[in-house]
Amino acid sequence: MKELWVILLIVSFGFLSLEIGLSTAILEIVAGIIGGNLLDVGSLPWIDFMANYGILGLMFLAGLELDKEELKKHAKHSLLLASSAYFVPFCVIFLATLPIFNLDIKQSALVAIALSTTSLALLYPILRERGLLNLQIGHVIMAAAMLIDIWSMISLTIIFAAIDYVTISFFAVLILFMWYAPKLGRWLFSRYRENLAEMELKFLLLILLALLFFAEKVMVSEAVLAFMMGFLFSEVLEEHGTLVDKLKGIVFAFFSPIFFFKAGSFMKFSIMNSTSLIVAAFLLPLSFFSKYLSSKVVFKRLRGGESLSKFVGVIFNFRLTFGIVSALFGLKAGIINPETYTAIITVIIASALISSIITRKEEGQIIQ
C-alpha cells in the first residue's frame, strides 16, 4: 500500500506543478516531505535504488547537453563563477558557526561544505524547462555547477577522508573505465542500432550502475561521475537521437521523480526541536545571501545583465544532492549531532523551495 501512495503523491504533485507553474522537481520534493513524514519510506528499499538511478540519469543527460567548444570558450568564466559561488559561502558559514554555535573546526567545515553546494540535479531540469540549455548562459551555469560539486567533493575528501592504496587502485580503474566505455558504446550502438531488445539502452543503464559502484569505492559523488560520463558520451550519441529520447523518457518520467521524492523525505518534522530550528533560522539567511551575492556579483562582472545575474544568484541556491550526502556523512561519522543534521537538511530543502518561488515570480524578467 505504501508503494501506491508514493506513486500517487509523485503523480499528483507532478500535475500540480503544471497547474501552478512551479518546477516539477521542486513539487516532487514537497511530495517527498509529505510522504516522508506520513509514510515509513525507509522501509521501501526499492526507493533508494530507483533514486540512485534518478540522479545518475539526470546527470548523464546534463553532461550530454554540454557543447565542448562552448565549454572551452567559457571555461575561465565558469571556473571564476564556481570558485566565488563555493568558497565565499564556505568561508562565511565556516567563520560564523565556529564562535556562534561553539563548533569545532571539523564540525564547522562540514556544515560549510553542505551549505555551499549547488545542485546540478536541480539546475538541469529548471534550465531545461526554461529553454536555456542551448544558450551560452546554460553552458556557463552547468559547467560552474559541476565545478562547485567538484570543489565540495575535494573539500570533503581532504578534510575527512582517509585515502589508501585500495582507493587509489579503484580510482585508476575508474579512469580506464570512463575512457573506454564511450569507445565500447560507439561499437555497440553501431552494431545493434534500434534493435527490439533495446541493447543500447540496457548498456547505458549498466554504465550508470557501474558508476554508482565506483562512486562508493573512490568516495566521489556519483553525480559528478555521471555528468562527466555523459559529457564523454556526447559525441558518441550525436547520431543516436532516438536512443537519447528513450533515455530521457525513462529518466524524467520514472527515475528522477523518485530521486526528488527521496530527497524531500529526508526532512523529518518528528526529529525537529527548538535547537535545530534556531540553527536553521540562523543558517538559512546566512547561506542564502552569501551564495546569492557571491554568484550575482561575479556573473554581472562577466557581462551578465542585471536580471540574468539575479537569476544566477537565486538558482545557485539550489542545494540538494551533495549537501545531503555531506550531512549524512557527518551524522554517520559522529561529526555532527542529529540537531545539526536536521538543521542542515531543513536549510537545504527550504533554500530550494524559496529559490523556486523567486524564479517563478520573476520568470518574465529573466530572459530579455
Describe the function of each predicted region.
Residues 73, 133-149, 154, 241-245, ...:
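Membrane-interface alpha-helices at helix entry/exit sites of multi-pass transporters
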Residues 1-5, 44-60, 104-118, 166-177, ...:
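Structural signature of hydrophobic alpha-helical transmembrane segments
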Residues 28-38, 81-94, 140-156, 197-213, ...:
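Small-residue-rich segments of transmembrane alpha-helices in multi-pass membrane proteins
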Residues 17-24, 33-77, 190-200, 204-282, ...:
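Membrane-interface junctions of multi-pass transporters
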Residues 98-112, 123-167:
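Membrane-interface helix-loop-helix junctions at boundaries between adjacent transmembrane segments
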Residues 77-130, 263-366:
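Transmembrane alpha-helices that form the ion-translocation and gating core
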Residues 10-15, 29, 33, 37, ...:
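Transmembrane alpha-helical segments of multi-pass membrane transport proteins and ion-pumping complexes
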